[in-house]
């Protein structure tokens, strides 16, 4: 019913003209990189980086019941989400497993859900399944907007170059219409699970091209870089940010993925509520998302299971990358709760290859 691919090929070609190198992964054209891994990761951690979020999808809800409907079927409270406010929520199955994590943006006359492209089909089908007599109309709006993320400690100052005081006037977890040299776009300021600040730009195609061209040509004294999936993946692992589909999928629940802060325990029923409540009450959480450090450089495409000292399978590596900051291969993975402690050693195994890896608290610090 709902297609996976929402890649805007024209925007991809625009970024290729700016130096992007692309690759096809699971039927989605992704931007791998623009420059070296070191340069892009440096901008993410120390400067300002801009990423084209074409691995995210944009779902639109219209109708008078939209907010109330979201409140009823997802984990977070939506009833008091005001116009131009932003809030993350989780769609969970009857078993309390993650179907998808979405960022909800309230435009008043409609609502946008920003969700991972690989969970888009499941989220849209799940929403569609429960629209029964509600004034809610569901559609894929990925073709209407382009989404960009600006991240790094210099982000706010950098944006002030182009948007003036408007960049400073957007409060946390909200958005507003901004004009920069006659180019209109929506600017959102977000705080993630670790308190890290980032900005989203939502713009129509031609305005997006003008804005980004202006940024690339007038970056001033800032350590600005366009970044691709490779460096952004390193940044996510370093900061312990679970991603779709590696960590956020229906094998795991919000407790295990460490996104339980997106569950409002004071609100009424939602799908999966009873299971999630019991997990906490009866201490039934079996595993946790952890960081892991490898002792040697390995191919980041390799798949590893985790074993205890008796060779019992106790977990799995879900994301793996080389970190220029840590100067090691680091990973995210799910590990048996009793072993998910800083400094614990477990064995990572891939076929005939095995090595000891160390559990690391998240986020990683140099």
Tell me what each language-model feature is.
Residues 2-37, 136-289, 313:
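Glycine-rich, acidic
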Residues 66-106, 153-192:
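A glycine-rich (often HGG/GG-containing) alpha/beta subdomain
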Residues 1-11, 102, 235, 253, ...:
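Glycine-rich, small/acidic residue-mixed loop/short-helix segments
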Residues 64-65, 116-121, 153-155, 204-209, ...:
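Helix N-cap motif at beta-to-alpha junctions
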Residues 111-113, 197-203, 327-336:
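A generic structural motif
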Residues 103, 114-122, 126-139:
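A generic, well-ordered mixed alpha/beta core segment in the N-terminal half of proteins
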Residues 1-88, 92-99:
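Acidic, proline/glycine-enriched N-terminal capping motif
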Residues 73, 126-129, 161-164, 209-221, ...:
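Short amphipathic alpha-helices in soluble, non-transmembrane regions
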């Amino acid at each position: 019913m709902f297609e996976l691919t929402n890649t805007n090929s024209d925007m991809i070609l625009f970024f290729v003209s700016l130096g992007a190198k692309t690759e096809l992964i699971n039927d989605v054209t992704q931007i791998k990189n623009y420059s070296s891994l070191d340069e892009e990761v440096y901008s993410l951690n120390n400067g300002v980086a801009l990423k084209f979020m074409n691995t995210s999808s944009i779902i639109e809800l219209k109708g008078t019941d939209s907010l109330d409907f979201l409140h009823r079927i997802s984990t977070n409270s939506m009833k008091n989400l005001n116009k131009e406010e932003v809030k993350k929520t989780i769609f969970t199955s009857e078993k309390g497993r993650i179907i998808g994590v979405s960022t909800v943006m309230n435009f008043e006359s409609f609502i946008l859900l920003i969700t991972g492209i690989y969970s888009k089909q499941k989220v849209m089908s799940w929403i569609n399944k429960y629209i029964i007599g509600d004034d809610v109309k569901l559609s894929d709006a990925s073709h209407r907007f382009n989404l960009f993320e600006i991240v790094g400690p210099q982000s706010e100052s950098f944006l002030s170059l182009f948007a003036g005081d408007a960049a400073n006037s957007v409060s946390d977890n909200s958005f507003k219409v901004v004009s920069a040299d006659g180019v209109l776009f929506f600017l959102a300021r977000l705080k993630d699970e670790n308190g890290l600040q980032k900005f989203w730009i939502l713009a129509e195609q031609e305005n997006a091209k003008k804005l980004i061209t202006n940024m690339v040509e007038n970056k001033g004294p800032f350590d600005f870089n366009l970044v691709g999936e490779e460096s952004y993946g390193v940044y996510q692992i370093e900061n312990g940010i679970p991603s779709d589909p590696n960590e956020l999928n229906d094998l795991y629940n919000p407790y295990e993925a460490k996104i339980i802060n997106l569950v409002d325990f004071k609100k009424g029923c939602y799908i999966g509520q009873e299971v999630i409540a019991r997990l906490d009450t009866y201490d039934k959480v079996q595993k946790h998302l952890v960081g892991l450090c490898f002792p040697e450089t390995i191919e980041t495409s390799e798949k590893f299971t985790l074993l205890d000292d008796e060779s019992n399978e106790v977990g799995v590596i879900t994301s793996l990358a080389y970190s220029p900051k840590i100067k090691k291969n680091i990973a995210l993975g799910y590990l048996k709760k009793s072993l998910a402690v800083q400094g614990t050693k477990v064995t990572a195994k891939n076929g005939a290859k095995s090595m000891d890896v160390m559990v690391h608290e998240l986020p990683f610090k140099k």
